[in-house]
Amino acid sequence: MGYAMSRFETDVSVIFSSSSDSETSHDSLINKPVKNLDHEIAQLTRLRSAPHENLSRDLLVKRVLPLSTMKMLAGREANVSGRGRFSSADCCHVVSRHLPVNDPCVVDQMTSRVYLSQFSTDGSLFIAGFQGCHIRIYNVDKGWKVQNDIIAKCVRWTITDASLSPDQKFLAYASLTPIAHIVKFGSAATESHANVTDIHDGLDFSSNDDGGYSFGVFSIKFSTDGREIVAGTSDESICVYDLEADRLSLRISAHESDVNSVCFADESGHLIYSGSDDNLCKVWDRRCFNAKGKPAGILMGHLEGITFIDSRGDGRYFISNGKDQTIKLWDIRKMSSNAGGTIQSRNSEWDYRWMEYPQEARDLKHPSDLSGATYKGHSVLCTLIRCYFSPDYSTGQKYIYTGSHDANVYIYDLVTGDQVSTLQYHKATVRDCSWHPNYPMLVSSSFDGEIVKWEYRGNDEAPVQGNNQRLQR
């Protein structure tokens, strides 16, 4: 379950992702031949998360056997790799098998839905946005103490998105209005009321051409240098706000429907990815915008609207979650200059907000699908559910994980496409989830109002199974 047909047919080398009996074990992943995935990303993932080839060659009795941590430690002592130490890939090989799928613990609970939740870049802070106008910032290193409780300004329906600045001093948040806000949260006061204890500066994403039309901001992200914010709006636009100049520096009509997700492709800030309810993902190169603001390329393959986009951070690969109940992996080198192909018709009256996805549509394929891989098993209904690459530092980005309408969190193997674990605890839709950048810890947030922390069960306890049973609270 989980992996569908890809347009690539190159086989790649075996990736060692299993463990000894005393460690996490996923039998379905043990040296399974990899097919139908672009050789390059499979190889890049292997280089980031597989042990050194000398360790694999000298310490494995057979290639089908797992390479345990104990064997790797013995190999390090014997300097089998010739380096005298573990490489980052060796470390990832060990840590990435310790999936954060055990011992769910409720970090916080409120009476309103949780719409977003994310760790900071260094993992020391965690932010959660609630429908009831609260944005809470937790200090992870101090026992998840609430460091700031921000009451958002001018919220319409809910807080749609929020983003921490790279220096972790400012928080930008958005709602279904043209004006987002930015607030400095490093003050001594725990509770930050709008324009009372802290100033919530408005970031106006409207233009003089709007004619007073009101729209909402669905997605908002800081650039890596913290100088700009990119936003996707319900009036089909992508906007870039220059924080130093305090003005809107770019606004283009990007899609033919709501722009549900935007992000910078890498640290340079030159490339922007966008996903929309017009079923398309687009790539925008700010260095070569022409007068008409055309994208650098278009990636088609989804049969329904895109709910979220996450970049691998290399300016080449990204994933998207779609209302067609799939996650797709993209290589922007495969993008097209136009949206070609005809999508097979379905019931146009279907609405993902309150209807199940039509069974007859589940096997439909886009005739011009440019994606590198498709992952299935989770449910994308009711809200803009998010998906992500697992952290580079601890896993080598070898997994993809996502929330789901069925109240679970799903983890897929990037290369094999296998569904390696399903986290079951919540009672309602899991809209967002976040994997700690350094440790085997994952936090899920749900419409049941709960923020739940998952960790790896150490101490040589029972190995993690592919699917956890629902735990009694």
Curated annotation (Swiss-Prot):
Per-repeat ranges for WD: 212-242, 254-285, 301-331, 377-413, 425-455
Record-linked Gene3D superfamilies: YVTN repeat-like/Quinoprotein amine dehydrogenase
Any one of the GO CC terms: Cul4-RING E3 ubiquitin ligase complex
Keywords, comma-separated and alphabetical: Repeat, WD repeat
Domain of life (superkingdom): Eukaryota
Single GO BP term: proteasome-mediated ubiquitin-dependent protein catabolic process
SUPFAM superfamilies reported for this sequence: WD40 repeat-like
InterPro entries: DCAF, DCAF11/LEC14B, G-protein_beta_WD-40_rep, WD40/YVTN_repeat-like_dom_sf, WD40_repeat_dom_sf, WD40_rpt
Family: Belongs to the WD repeat LEC14B family.
Name this protein carries in UniProt: LEC14B protein
